[in-house]
Amino acid sequence: MPMRSASHRVLVVTCCVFLLGSVCSPREVPMKTEQNAQSQEQATRAAIDRFNEAFNRHDADGLAPFLTEDTVFEDTSPAPDGRRIEGKAAVVEFWRGWFVRNADARFEAEEVIVGGNRATVLWVYHKMRNGQPWHLRGVDVFTVRDGKVAAKLAYVKG
């Protein structure tokens, strides 16, 4: 192997470090990851907002486009664990009946916290009970997949 000068070896090493650094810059990886996370969170938030808008219109058929085929809804009742409803058709039918039974009901999202494909919604449920305004507080934990609600797990206070 021919002997190279020290300055030649330094130049080769410097070029390799520069080239590897420009191809594999650690500064770019977090930026791309951050952009992906922001994109995912924006998609999650948009899915939750669309779902809540259709919900407050009491539009069961309007919810359907925002649900995955294998969506899961865990209701707050009956106590102690609630019931689990699986599949888009079953969840839409559940909400159709619920909207009829609770025609004056309205959910107010107090806060929506998004992390990746998950969202937590702190809400107040308003309706009339015995002619008087009534409310209940709760939390929904959503999982979003491909821009649609894959799971909505509901929890209430009291």
PLM region spans:
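Bacterial N-terminal signal peptides that target proteins for export
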Residues: P2-V13
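Bacterial N-terminal signal peptides
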Residues: V12-S22
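Short, low-complexity N-terminal intrinsically disordered segments enriched in polar/charged residues
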Residues: C24-E69, K88
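Short beta-strand edge/turn micro-motifs at domain boundaries
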Residues: V29, H135-G158
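A solvent-exposed, acidic/Ser-Thr-rich amphipathic alpha-helical stretch
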Residues: E41, A60-G115
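Hydrophobic pocket/interface hotspot
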Residues: F51, G62-L63, T71, G87, ...
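Hydrophobic/aromatic beta-strand elements that line small-molecule binding cavities or substrate pockets
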Residues: F107-V112, V124-Y125, R137-F142
